[in-house]
Amino acid sequence: MMERFAQIQRTGGPGVIEWADVPLTEPAPGEVRMRNLAVGLNFIDTYHRNGLYPMAKPCGLGMEAAGIIEAVGDGVSDWQVGDRVATFGPTIGAYCTARNIAANSLFGVPDDISHEVAAAGLLKGCTTEFLVERCAKVQPQWDVLVHAAAGGVGLLLVQWLKHVGARVIGTVSTDEKAALARAAGADHVILYGKEDVARQVRELTGGKGVEVSFDGVGLETWEMSLTATARRGLIVSYGNASGPVSGVNLATLAQKGSLYVSRPTLFDYYHNPAERAAGAEYVFDMFRQGVIEMTIGQRYALEDAAQAHRDLEARKTIGSSVLIPSGIK
């Protein structure tokens, strides 16, 4: 049985993504064969591709997908052929039509959650959960800054923060994205290319700044976050969309008001299969209750992954994106 797999032989731009027909064997003990119905696109995929997060080559790409089980290996008792499942890692290689994958890295997808929502929202939803509830521990009435508030994680952050009672200030790059952030619940939206973000934040908060800044943009917004965050406030740097922040002078944190900084990663908060299973169930419940909703702004053919990477890195996307294997409706 031949399946289509994306792979990279070297790091670089989107053009390094190659496609190959690879024979798929029967699942090994502890594995299942999962056929993808939708694959999630995440910024971490670009970091693996461009070498910011090094991996041994050659390697696959992609961490997040949803689909159905086609075969079950020996020793697997939790899953059956036909089950609807999703995964968000830690195994990389989701850019494919089907693959054999460890059974304990899968989560059941409820019947009322579409495969596209599961593929687009599981990793981002779990990221949002740990950022808000366990890393920053956001409290009601806090003022919170969300950079890239119309992005995949950004929109979920806005909704989750409103759910816990925070006042949300979002930054975006266009008027179209500003409207999307407001529709998600943002109390105020700032166009960071046209307005002084830190000054606007200070004005909106009576001069004090925000208790928490969620910054997934990185290099371009780091100084904004430093200046917009309140005394003894927290900057949560969870991504590098514009490039990594480096050479940080710790004395600056004192000068800006004894600030705290965290650089968390998903798999330190979802460290084992039990934690990942509990988190997935919680996030699916939040979708089911309507606390958070997915905005899937782009759908690409699976083999157009390179173009999807170009659009994501150029900030042309809105909300989340999915890659759809050929023949899937």
Give, region by region, the residue ranges found by the protein language model.
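Glycine-rich beta-strand-centered segment in the early N-terminal region that forms part
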Residues: 23-40, 50-93
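NAD(P)H dinucleotide-binding glycine-rich loop of Rossmann-like/cofactor-binding domains
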Residues: 47, 87-150
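Short glycine-centered segments of the SAM/dcSAM-binding site in methyltransferase folds
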Residues: 84, 143, 167, 233-234, ...
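Short, glycine/polar-rich helix-capping loops at beta-to-alpha or helix-loop-helix junctions
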Residues: 94-96, 173-180, 245-250
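Mid-domain Rossmann-like dinucleotide-binding core that forms the NAD(H)/NADP(H) cofactor-binding site
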Residues: 119-195
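Glycine-rich phosphate-binding loop and adjacent beta-alpha segment
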Residues: 172, 220-292, 325-329
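Short amphipathic alpha-helix with an adjacent loop that forms part of the alpha/beta core around
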Residues: 197-207
